[in-house]
């Protein structure tokens, strides 16, 4: 990692380097939703790199203290947010719980696993926020269990309009360590993509559901956006 970079650019640089994020404007990936996307993100790869894993943990702790104040507990979202959530909880000396993607079919049929008697104020840890559907489903499960969700932190977000609206409607504040615009900025610097690729990649975020069509019909040379804050 380049020590001269600010934290958001530094994390973006490393995600690209270890191929946790892959960009390909010509051969798109297919998401579970059916969307064709020029980006694929697997932040679980960061867990295999101790230096970056530690840096992410430190940035999460700083962000939680700064943005939300110290909570009673840390909650991880299965599965990508569990390991990072445990590391954050350990660093902060806090209890840890996690939220399943679906209730168990046996036993207590829990959605939330862990001891909920140790506090009610929770900050949620995610590895990735895309549309926000699964992340906010976890928030709903925590609220149903009687928790007060102070906010959510994630390693990365695409900052899609649909996610921003969903988080606003759910009254959940999200703080991401890095995001799509910052990633593209670093990808240009490190020559992972060309300026021509950049125009197509920016158009994807405008209308991800219809991106292959708009990428083919819109002219190149989109006006650059400022990195999201």
Regions found by a protein language model. Give the residues of each.
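Short, glycine/charge-rich flexible loops or terminal/linker lids adjacent to PRPP-binding catalytic cores
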Residues: 85-123, 131-137
């Amino acid at each position: 990692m380049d020590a001269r970079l600010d934290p958001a650019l530094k994390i973006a640089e490393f995600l690209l380097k270890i191929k946790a994020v892959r960009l390909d404007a010509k051969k798109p990936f297919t998401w579970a939703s059916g969307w064709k996307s020029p980006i694929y993100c697997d932040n679980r790869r960061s867990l295999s790199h101790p230096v970056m894993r530690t840096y992410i943990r430190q940035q999460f702790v700083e962000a939680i203290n700064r943005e939300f104040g110290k909570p009673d507990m840390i909650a991880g979202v299965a599965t990508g947010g569990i390991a990072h959530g445990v590391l954050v909880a350990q660093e902060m000396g806090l209890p840890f719980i996690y939220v399943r993607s679906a209730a168990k079919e046996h036993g207590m049929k829990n959605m939330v696993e862990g001891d909920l008697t140790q506090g009610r104020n929770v900050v949620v840890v995610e590895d990735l926020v895309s549309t926000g559907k699964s992340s906010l489903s976890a928030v709903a499960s925590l609220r149903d269990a009687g928790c007060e969700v102070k906010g959510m932190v994630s390693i990365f977000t695409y900052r899609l309009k649909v996610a921003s609206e969903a988080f606003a409607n759910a009254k959940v504040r999200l703080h991401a360590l890095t995001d799509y615009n910052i990633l593209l900025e670093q990808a240009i610097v490190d020559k992972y993509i060309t300026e021509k690729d950049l125009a197509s990649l920016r158009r994807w975020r405008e209308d991800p559901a219809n991106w292959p069509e708009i990428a083919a019909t819109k002219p190149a040379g989109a006006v650059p956006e400022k990195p999201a804050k």
